[in-house]
């Protein structure tokens, strides 16, 4: 996979922000689940 990215740096460049955001997505889902659970239990 890294070989492919090394061959296509200009094609991969637009996806850099997506790769930067990827590790944050599970945290966002965790926060969303926590807020949803809290709102459901507070009803």
Swiss-Prot record:
It is found in: Plastid, Chloroplast thylakoid membrane. GO terms for biological process: photosynthesis. Residues 1-6 form a propeptide. It is a single-pass membrane protein. Its main location: plastid. Coiled coil: none annotated. NCBIfam families: PRK02553.1. PSII is composed of 1 copy each of membrane proteins PsbA, PsbB, PsbC, PsbD, PsbE, PsbF, PsbH, PsbI, PsbJ, PsbK, PsbL, PsbM, PsbT, PsbX, PsbY, PsbZ, Psb30/Ycf12, at least 3 peripheral proteins of the oxygen-evolving complex and a large number of cofactors. It forms dimeric complexes. This is Photosystem II reaction center protein K. The lineage of its organism: Eukaryota, Viridiplantae, Chlorophyta, Ulvophyceae, Oltmannsiellopsidales.
